[in-house]
């Protein structure tokens, strides 16, 4: 250990690295045998086999095995014997062929090893590691610990691969848009004004303009439209966006999107360009050829068949609407649902009889809880027996005619062993309930192929949806989406020229053609309840721009974090972001957000009214 700590003491006097790095650790292959190389990295693991020291040296590219023994490499042996996990070292040595018995097919460098002629210690570890970083360690580390010591977490192979994958995706986006399609990258402001876009804004007081506030952008939407008015034609940006909203696994208060806007292009042309972009990303990053064009579903078809507007089509389990069959049913729950303007739908589950018991469907069961969380009051069911007859609760069986029974079996394609789960009530609740059950059952039954890639467009969204809490219409996407030209006579029921790209049940991109005429934009503002004065106050700059020759235009934005999450096979976007926030919107590494000096608040002419609970 004497030489080790002597080396540490000399670090302060070491002004430069002794030798240029010749390779990254993970790059070395058989073709490099015989070369003398210099590597830098961290000790991933150290092993002593009969007096011979083996080190796994790690950098962002991977791992390579380093060997030091007292006979062949006496100059490096003493220091090699003193090294520990996560020490930072410089190693110079010869690339040699590994002996047959020590070949390691699990790593790309597994055919070679480095005989270390020289080892320099660049830095040590002075505190006990909060968790093991080594790629050989399989312990499950608590996420809060990983986020607090993110600099250690990012050294781990999985995280290093994820961050590099993210870089590859962004690089592919830039290359295709610039080199193939002629887009230009333009930065838009981070400090802007607060505009109603759905979620809460993050707001910042202005010191030089007391009483006035900036907002961080929820998206570059308005600026990119103004860029089209400015003649920029094909714009893109890897944009940082901010939304003060409740968080979940695939949401963050600050996130990144690929933002695009194009002038003089139809909806069809925009979709085709984006299919080629996405296909290029998959081929470049994943080596996967995607068949073009992608399938399309209208919003109405997606809701009818899957109960949601972002269906996972890797498995079937499609919903069946039997409202017309049940409108005259003797079963009051079904009959009343239809009479009150609602629907009755069925989720048919092959082999459901065998795997799903009545206990799970009734109150207290897991499927009942799933339905309740979606707003359903209960679950009705029919089981198809081996003889083709049905089993269900008496209230349904006694009030189902033979004709209705046969129509249900025929429409659902139900065979012996099928379980039919019913949803009845308002359309939104029924669809949400059966969508959740569909996803839960697909996971339980192993119906989802994790290697399958299903991309599809959902098109023809409604322009507006009803906000029951505020008792008004609101834009389903945003109020700058252009209505379908055939529906201009009735904006309230109009379809939008909008399109979402869905990847294995996740919305990864959403866009639309935009309104580019002032009078249409003003009509949309009026439809969502904005008075002319409010519209002028919040969006006057956009309306003014529309007076000066605005081209037809449209665009799309991709959620970069979510797209990379799916590429990486992760379940949370926190695992593909270098420094994410928790679900409580905190950075555990820096302990942000934090308090500030009263002096700073005074300079900003603000004060906090928050009083901590005693």
Curated annotation (Swiss-Prot):
Segments carrying the region annotation (Aspartate) are 221-224
PROSITE patterns recorded: AA_TRNA_LIGASE_II (PS50862)
Q: Superkingdom of this entry's organism?
A: Bacteria
Q: Name one Pfam family in it.
A: GAD
Predominant subcellular localization, coarse grouping: cytoplasm
Q: Does the keyword Lyase apply?
A: no
Q: Which UniProt keywords apply?
A: Aminoacyl-tRNA synthetase, ATP-binding, Cytoplasm, Ligase, Nucleotide-binding, Protein biosynthesis
Swiss-Prot/TrEMBL site (Important for tRNA non-discrimination) positions: 49
- Could you tell me one molecular function GO term of this UniProt entry? aspartate-tRNA(Asn) ligase activity
The listed locations are: Cytoplasm
GO annotation, biological process: aspartyl-tRNA aminoacylation
Q: What chemistry does it catalyse, as a reaction equation?
A: tRNA(Asx) + L-aspartate + ATP = L-aspartyl-tRNA(Asx) + AMP + diphosphate
- CC per GO annotation: cytoplasm
- List positions binding L-aspartate: 197, 243, 477, 514
Q: Which residues bind ATP?
A: 243-245, 252, 507, 559-562
Which class of enzymes does this protein belong to? ligase
Task: Tell me which family the UniProt entry assigns to this protein.
Answer: Belongs to the class-II aminoacyl-tRNA synthetase family. Type 1 subfamily.
Its biological purpose is as follows: Aspartyl-tRNA synthetase with relaxed tRNA specificity since it is able to aspartylate not only its cognate tRNA(Asp) but also tRNA(Asn). Reaction proceeds in two steps: L-aspartate is first activated by ATP to form Asp-AMP and then transferred to the acceptor end of tRNA(Asp/Asn).
Entries under HAMAP family matching the protein: Asp_tRNA_synth_type1
Summarize subunit and interaction data from the UniProt record for this chain: Homodimer.
Name of the featured protein: Aspartate--tRNA(Asp/Asn) ligase
Source organism of the structure: Trichormus variabilis (strain ATCC 29413 / PCC 7937) (Anabaena variabilis)
Annotated gene? aspS
